[in-house]
A protein has these predicted regions:
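A generic alpha-to-beta junction signature in SAM-dependent methyltransferases
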Residues: 37-39, 62-63, 128, 135
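Short SAM/SAH-binding signature in class I
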Residues: 46, 108-116, 267
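Conserved catalytic/acceptor-binding region of the Class I
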Residues: 125, 132-211, 226
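Conserved Class I S-adenosyl-L-methionine
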Residues: 3-7, 14, 52-54, 178-274
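Conserved alpha-helix/loop element of class I SAM-dependent methyltransferases that forms part
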Residues: 23-43, 58
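Class I SAM-dependent methyltransferase Rossmann-like catalytic core
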Residues: 11-24
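A short SAM/SAH-binding and catalytic strip from SAM-dependent methyltransferases
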Residues: 110-124, 147
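Class I SAM-dependent methyltransferase SAM/SAH-binding core
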Residues: 44-102, 111, 125-126
Length: 274
């Protein structure tokens, strides 16, 4: 996987991600995933590609007691995760490491969670086999990935604008968020790693931003798309961003009421057992 296609954030970008994008998008999917996975008191839970830790924190709050571990390859994301307070429940242990070679013994966890991360792994099958390995017999897997980009109108509007104003291929990173959209492919990957009782639930969340302008601004500041414009001189950058905002705002006019943007976002949620 090319460097630009990896979900890599550092320093202030990770802080912006936690401050703005987690409340707007990620926490909705995190709550849905944790509800479906239903972690129980006393269980050992692993959150793979934990980012700034929203899934791990929600799981810990639900459990009350047990063990929760967050794993991510990104130092900046983990720094933010460690800096945030945890609520009720067990202390969360944060580990830096790859999902392709997890630093845990076999049969360590009762439940493995992975929210919106599998599509970014350079070897998805290896990552799933690692999840299988670290689960106890009959252990549970719960993961989510975005479906087709057309099922998230704001993302589709953004990639079209990026390619129009920054050249073909500028949207590759954003499009990669939706690169595991085929439910049949997803099923075969999970089953092929050894999991059984595999079910896929396709569901939708309504995502809100103060405006289309704010959606674009955050996408170009708190995600890997920031690299597309960060090296430009200020005048050129501002003109490009204004043009992208104009196109996205026009495309999303039907999703805007009183200036506020609200659009549907669809994802596949997978539940399975070892």
């Amino acid at each position: 996987m090319a460097e630009q296609e990896q979900w890599q954030l550092q320093g202030s970008a990770a802080e912006l991600y936690e401050r703005y994008l987690v409340p707007a998008i990620t926490v909705l999917w995190a709550a849905d995933l944790v509800d479906r996975a239903a972690p129980q008191s006393g269980e050992r839970v692993l959150d793979v590609a934990c980012g700034t830790g929203v899934v791990a924190r929600l799981a810990a709050e639900r459990m009350g007691s047990g063990q929760v571990v967050g794993l991510d390859i990104n130092t900046g994301m983990l720094a933010v995760a460690r800096s945030l307070p945890t609520g009720a429940g067990p202390r969360i242990d944060w580990h830096e490491g790859s999902a392709l070679e997890m630093p845990f013994p076999d049969a360590t966890f009762d439940l493995v969670l992975c929210q919106l991360g599998l599509q970014f792994f350079p070897d998805r099958s290896s990552a799933l086999r690692e999840m299988f390995r670290v689960l106890v017999p009959d252990g549970r897997l719960a993961l989510s990935v975005f479906s087709a980009i057309e099922r998230t109108p704001a993302a589709k509007a953004l990639v079209d604008a990026l390619d129009r104003h920054l050249g073909p291929g500028a949207s590759a990173t954003k499009r990669s968020e939706h690169s595991l959209a085929d439910a049949d492919e997803l099923y075969q990957l999970v089953a092929g790693a050894g999991f059984r009782q595999v079910t896929i639930h396709t569901t939708t969340q309504n995502i809100r931003f103060p405006s289309s302008k704010e959606y674009v601004r955050l996408q170009l500041a708190a995600t890997p798309q920031a690299g597309l414009v960060s090296g430009m001189d200020a005048g050129h950058r501002d003109a490009i961003i204004a043009a992208i905002i104009g196109d996205v705002s026009s495309s999303l006019a039907i999703y805007s009421t009183g200036g506020e943007l609200m659009f549907p976002q669809e994802a596949h949620v997978v539940l399975a057992r070892k």
